[in-house]
């Protein structure tokens, strides 16, 4: 067998560091992540690991990007798995289930993405592309719903002027026009799904809700009605 190239060795070592870092997330949480300890665990001297990740923050960024990409893969695969593309309700429900399933299978990575901010860490712009894959799935469905003329559920109020202005930051991600009312309704759905998943994962649903699966189905089916799918 020919010797591995430098690039192959680097990729293998980078993978080992990230794998150990994810294990450490489960053990101590992101705030206590120790690059030196990870280096020892994978058989490197502490100074050598900085050739791969110059700082703890860069290692955190790599973990965040990897986790967002894994969640993005799960969401996109779930959407693609619905064969009849005009069944927007089934596609939406598949996306919601994929988010929850991934979160429950990867609770520590989910907490890194959507839990308490890590003290002193500011995520760089490089994380936004991966993070945008999840919101992008919702926005694509919103565009298709607009194109099909789906009637939204009865509104409970009008979109506030400040919200209209804030939507200017969303529009660049849209390939076709979508009304402000519909964008806001889909943003509500997005926050509801992640709010439910976070409440469940972080242990805040133990009173009043006994069947988390049934409750999640009820919540997401109500969202289907609200979105007019």
Residue ranges and their predicted role:
Residues 66-72:
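Short, basic, alpha-helical segments at the C-terminal edge of helix-turn-helix-like DNA-binding modules
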Residues 1-28, 32-37, 54-62, 66:
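Basic, helix-initiating cap at the start of DNA-binding domains
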Residues 116-127:
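Solvent-exposed, charged amphipathic helical/linker segments at domain boundaries
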Residues 136-229:
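C-terminal peripheral helix-coil segments that are non-catalytic and often amphipathic
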Residues 62, 77-109, 128-135:
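Hydrophobic alpha-helical connector segments
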Residues 36-40, 49:
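Append "Primarily bacterial transcriptional regulators
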């Amino acid at each position: 067998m020919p010797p591995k190239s430098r690039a192959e060795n680097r990729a293998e070592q980078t993978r080992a560091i990230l794998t150990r870092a994810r294990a450490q997330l489960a053990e101590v949480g992101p705030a206590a992540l120790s690059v030196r300890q990870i280096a020892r665990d994978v058989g490197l001297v502490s100074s050598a690991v900085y050739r791969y990740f110059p700082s703890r923050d860069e290692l955190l960024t790599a973990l965040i990007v990897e986790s967002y990409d894994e969640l993005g893969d799960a969401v996109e695969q779930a959407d693609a798995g619905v064969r009849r593309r005009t069944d927007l309700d089934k596609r939406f429900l598949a996306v919601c289930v994929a988010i929850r399933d991934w979160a429950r299978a990867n609770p520590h990575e989910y907490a890194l993405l959507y839990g308490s901010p890590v003290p002193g860490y500011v995520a760089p712009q490089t994380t936004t592309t991966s993070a945008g894959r999840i919101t992008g799935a919702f926005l694509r469905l919103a565009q298709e719903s607009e194109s099909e003329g789906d009637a939204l559920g009865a509104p409970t109020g009008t979109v506030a002027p400040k919200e209209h202005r804030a939507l200017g930051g969303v529009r660049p991600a849209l390939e076709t026009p979508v009304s402000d009312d519909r964008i806001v309704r889909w943003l509500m759905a997005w926050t509801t799904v992640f709010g439910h998943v976070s409440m469940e994962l972080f242990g805040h649903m133990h009173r009043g809700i006994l069947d988390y699966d049934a409750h999640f189905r009820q919540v997401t089916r109500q969202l289907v009605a609200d979105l007019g799918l």
